[in-house]
A protein has these predicted regions:
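Structural preference for beta-rich elements and adjacent junctions enriched in aromatics
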Residues: 1-142
């Protein structure tokens, strides 16, 4: 699926309400599908993406009658609850942002291991997997 992000000149207030004219006119994505089998899901979920000179805006319409969220700690494992997730592909990296119904944020930046080479653009101390605070995806030291 391809979705086009549309430029907006209207001011958008970040308040969780998608009632500005820009959102009302923005084309919504097709209905989301099951991540495992690609089939239809029980409840409708769609998104729209807008941008201006400063921000990228992503709005979700989620038809979920039984929303559950308990985690309030930033970067807690909110993907175990109801949340929305955004992945931005950077080629050999990706940025992930998740937000649950309590506005708890899970944010991470991944660099594929094959992209990390000595002398390459990611050969910086912050990304050294042998540093004390560097963790692999599973949370264990490499």
């Amino acid at each position: 699926m391809t979705y086009i992000a549309y430029r907006t000149k209207e001011k958008i207030v970040i308040d969780g309400k998608l009632n500005e004219n820009a959102w009302l006119q923005a084309p919504k994505s097709p209905r989301f599908v099951d991540i495992v089998n690609g089939g239809p899901v029980l409840y409708d979920t769609r998104a729209a993406v807008l941008w201006d000179d400063v921000y990228l805006y992503i709005g979700f319409w989620v038809e979920e009658p039984f929303v559950r969220a308990d985690i309030t700690e930033r970067d807690g494992l909110i993907f175990t609850e109801n949340d929305v997730e955004v992945f931005i592909d950077g080629g050999d990296t990706y940025y992930e942002l998740e937000v649950n119904a309590l506005n708890t944020i899970y944010e991470v930046f991944f660099i594929w291991k094959d992209a990390y080479k000595r002398g390459g653009k990611y050969d910086v101390p912050e990304f050294d997997v042998h540093e004390r605070d560097a963790y692999t995806f599973a949370g264990n030291h490499d």
